[in-house]
Swiss-Prot record:
Described function: Acts as a chain editing deubiquitinating enzyme that binds and cleaves 'Lys-48'-linked polyubiquitin chains, with a preference for chains containing four or more ubiquitin molecules thereby modulating protein degradation by the ubiquitin-proteasome pathway. Probably by regulating the IGF-1-insulin-like pathway, regulates lifespan. Regulates germline DNA double-strand-break repair and apoptosis in response to DNA damage by recruiting E4 ubiquitin-protein ligase ufd-2 to DNA repair foci. Interacts with key regulators of transcription and represses transcription.
EC number(s) per entry: 3.4.19.12
Region (Interaction with cdc-48.1 and cdc-48.2): 296-299
Record protein name field: Ataxin-3 homolog
Residue segments, region Disordered: 254-317
GO cellular component entries: cytoplasm; nucleolus; nucleus; synapse
Molecular-function GO terms, alphabetical: cysteine-type deubiquitinase activity
Domain Josephin per the UniProt entry, residue ranges: 7-178
Basic and acidic residues bias: start-end ranges: 294-317
Effect of residue 20 to A: Loss of catalytic activity. In a cdc-48.1 (tm544) mutant background, causes an increase in longevity and resistance to oxidative stress
Stored Pfam families: Josephin, UIM, UIM_2
């Protein structure tokens, strides 16, 4: 990557301890504005406020509802920190956020929580980037990937918060608006490997679900759809959180192919899905589908969208 690459203008913090909330806030705001001590003070302030509201005059010593010893902070702490910048966080499942849920690309940024790990999806210019402190740096995302990723993790019960308000202007905003980041070139060897994997993916999924001939994708958008779908498959133990994005891409794509070859609904199989947050299921909500049934539904939705894209392209011709 060249030193002059616009992506290098994006402020990025690497993971330290479990300070992902601090890193997420600073990367969202594009400056090293918050330290652990600042968020700790906010957490203590939030605890005292909650104790007063609940009338709990004798709280458990050393216990906090808004932080833990490892450095994790609650969404309430992040919300309080962003109030200074007139920014508001609203769960995408809130009925008021229906427009963002239907068209995620209309937002400027999202703060996401997966297994108590905070990271950011943020727009600079007209391009989306993943700012995740466990990665080596900012990751350029396609619009298709952003939409598919947010839809998938939201449907699995993870916490996605829409950032509302005007984000502080940064050098990266100005530079990338003028000079968009060019996606990295794929080497011939890597491209050949990707085509082979994609062909197998579409053939197996297409034949399993009756989605047509299962021809390999011939557009970048269709490739993005497949990769985004594969990326949504994560293991139950959360081991991916510490691995590089490139390793996760390849591993999850392989898993998606394996899942497409698993027994169908008439022969239930144990299929790893994104685990559901305990607090994410609203009271009175129905129990989630079985793993096999949910996986079948997700694959069916993906194939329907893929076939629709092909039909639209054929109509244009």
């Amino acid at each position: 990557m060249s030193k002059d690459d616009p992506i290098n203008s994006i402020f990025f913090e690497h993971q330290e301890a479990a300070l992902c909330a601090q890193h997420a806030l600073n990367m969202l705001l594009q400056d090293a504005l918050y330290k652990w001590q600042d968020l700790r003070d906010l957490a203590i302030q939030m605890d005292k406020m909650e104790q007063q509201i609940l009338g709990n005059a004798n709280p458990t010593p050393g216990r906090s509802e808004n932080m833990n010893e490892s450095g994790y902070f609650s969404i309430q702490v992040l919300e309080k920190a962003l109030e200074t910048f007139s920014l508001k966080l609203t769960n995408i499942e809130n009925p008021a956020m229906v427009d963002y849920k239907n068209n995620p690309l209309t937002a400027r940024a999202y703060i996401c929580n997966l297994r108590e790990h905070w990271f950011v999806l943020r727009k600079f210019g007209n391009q989306w980037f993943e700012l995740n402190s466990v990665n080596r740096g900012p990751k350029l995302l396609s619009d298709t990937y952003v939409s598919m990723f947010l839809h998938q993790v939201s449907s699995e019960g993870y916490s996605i918060f829409v950032v509302q308000g005007v984000l502080p202007r940064s050098d990266a905003d100005d530079l990338i608006s003028l000079c968009p980041v060019v996606p990295p070139k794929v080497t011939p060897k890597k491209e050949q490997k990707l085509e082979k994997v994609m062909t197998k993916f579409f053939n197996t999924v297409g034949k399993r679900l009756g989605g047509g001939s299962g021809a390999p994708p011939d557009s970048q958008e269709e490739k993005d759809l497949a990769i985004a779908f594969a990326m949504s498959m994560e293991t139950k133990d959360g081991s991916e959180v510490s691995r590089s994005s490139a390793e996760i891409d390849e591993e999850n794509l392989r898993k998606a192919i394996e899942l497409s070859q698993a027994p169908g609904p008439s022969e239930p199989a144990e299929i790893p899905l994104l685990t559901r947050s305990r607090s994410s299921t609203p009271p009175g909500a129905s129990e989630p589908f079985s793993n096999a049934e949910q996986q079948r539904r997700d694959r069916q939705k993906f194939l329907e969208r893929f076939e629709k894209k092909k039909e639209e392209r054929n109509d244009e011709k």
